[in-house]
């Protein structure tokens, strides 16, 4: 009888672990940033980079809405705010990487990079 209870305990524990694993998997598929933020907050650095690289606010929104998160270039555990690198091509043909940081104030645009093109920017 005692052996039956032990087996039953392990079977139940196994199914609970399976269920928790599925829940974590479902949550990990959720997008960590609001891709339809009403208001973006641009840092001075982002504005400077956008200006010298000819990147418009419309293109920033394109990448936000349709870009892929590059987790190798992102810092999801950064404090106080995580940072996510989104990459994609704009309708103008630019291949961009834009760093976004969700914060309590809103979605902050940290910097904008045109991949594969070297621009001479004097942004400090």
Predicted regions and their residues:
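Ribonuclease/tRNase effector modules and their secretory precursors
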Residues: 2-124
């Amino acid at each position: 009888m005692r052996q039956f209870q032990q087996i039953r305990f392990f079977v139940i524990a196994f199914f609970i672990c399976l269920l928790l694993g599925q829940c974590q998997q479902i949550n990990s598929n959720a997008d960590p940033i609001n891709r339809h933020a009403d208001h973006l907050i641009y840092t001075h650095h982002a504005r400077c980079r956008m200006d010298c690289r000819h990147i418009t606010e419309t293109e920033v929104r394109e990448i936000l809405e349709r870009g892929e998160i590059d987790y190798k270039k992102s810092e999801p555990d950064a404090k106080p705010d995580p940072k996510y690198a989104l990459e994609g091509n704009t309708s103008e043909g630019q291949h961009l990487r834009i760093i976004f940081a969700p914060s309590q104030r809103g979605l902050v645009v940290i910097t904008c990079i045109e991949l594969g093109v070297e621009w001479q920017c004097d942004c400090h």
